[in-house]
Amino acid sequence: PYHPNPAIAERYDCKVAIDKLVWDFRVNGSELCKRQLLEIIEDVVLRDIMLRECTMRLNGLKVVYQFCMQEHIEDLRYITQVQADKLEKYADTAYAKELAERELRECQKYLFCHAKNILWDSTVWYLERLHLEQYRVNPSNPVKKFSFMGIEKRENREILQEYMKYCLGVTH
């Protein structure tokens, strides 16, 4: 397998089935979505994690990629619940479905938490990015995210997001 860093390429040499490492980014689909997934794939590959965990993550990401290309998903930040529910069709086993669903959530989290600016129009907000004061978080049952994926009508979702920003005390 090729990677610009030879040490990383060597890590995967002869240890993983090659089909798990081959990604065809020439497929028709959103360039933004492809770039988002490529950034996440690179992050996974560069992490110092066990090869088994890395392989599981790549397997899930591959199903997410195939799903996004076939469903013409433009941007992972705006996936709705109806779209996410379709993901199960793209996995051939219950295990692959579970991996893909987990990776879709991880993609959303990565994109929200690593963006230069907070992406207030995303369909999922992760509160770790908002750095709320300790007194505003219930330590026995902390809320980790707000999901707006179930709100299909864009205008309604935007109104609720503005209201949630108000509730959180965010004015920018």
Q: Could you say what each language-model-derived stretch is?
A:
Residues P1-H172:
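Charge-rich, intrinsically disordered N-terminal extensions
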